[in-house]
């Protein structure tokens, strides 16, 4: 069974409850700051925490948002994860016609996942790839 929950603030406490003390203080601070700027969701498969993600709008009137995602390790149930991700991104694109973000160039699995979601990549800057996902009219 798949479920998605809106996560109460702060996200770092939620992750500690689900996965133990896996975040550094810097990571916890960054994620809590992202959480202050937008809503955060958590995905579960068979009641097991899989990942969390959120959107950070550029402003109150912005038509684009920054997508971030965190998981403790490799995602299992990949087909289910990709399909649910596609559904979630389509919902996000109803609110924000453009979604932007970054991933590591060395993370081939993240790039494949983002391509399944419709991401277009810009040339790499060091180990960072910028991506854009646009609403199709």
Give the location of each predicted region.
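A conserved beta-strand-loop-helix scaffold within acyl/acetyltransferase catalytic domains
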Residues: 53-62, 121-122
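Conserved acetyl-CoA binding element of GNAT-fold acetyltransferases
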Residues: 62-76, 129
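C-terminal "cap" of GNAT-fold acetyltransferases
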Residues: 127-137
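Conserved beta-hairpin
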Residues: 37-55
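Short loop/turn motifs at secondary-structure junctions and domain boundaries
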Residues: 32-36
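Conserved beta-strand-loop-alpha-helix junction that forms the acyl-donor binding cleft
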Residues: 96-115, 120, 125-127
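Short amphipathic alpha-helix that is part of the acyltransferase structural core
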Residues: 1-28
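Conserved acetyl-CoA-binding loop-helix of GNAT-fold acetyltransferases
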Residues: 77-91, 112, 116
């Amino acid at each position: 069974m798949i479920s998605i929950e809106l996560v109460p603030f702060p996200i770092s406490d939620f992750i500690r409850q689900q996965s133990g003390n896996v975040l550094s203080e810097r990571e916890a601070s960054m994620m809590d700051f992202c959480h202050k700027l937008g809503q955060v969701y958590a995905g579960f498969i068979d009641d097991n925490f899989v990942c969390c993600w959120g959107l950070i709008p550029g402003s109150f009137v912005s038509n684009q948002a920054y997508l971030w995602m965190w998981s403790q390790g490799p995602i299992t149930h990949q087909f289910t994860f990709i399909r649910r991700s596609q559904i979630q991104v389509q919902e996000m694109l109803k609110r924000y016609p453009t979604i932007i973000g970054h991933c590591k160039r060395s993370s081939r699995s993240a790039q494949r996942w983002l391509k399944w979601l419709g991401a277009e990549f810009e040339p790499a800057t060091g180990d960072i790839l910028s991506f854009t996902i646009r609403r199709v009219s």
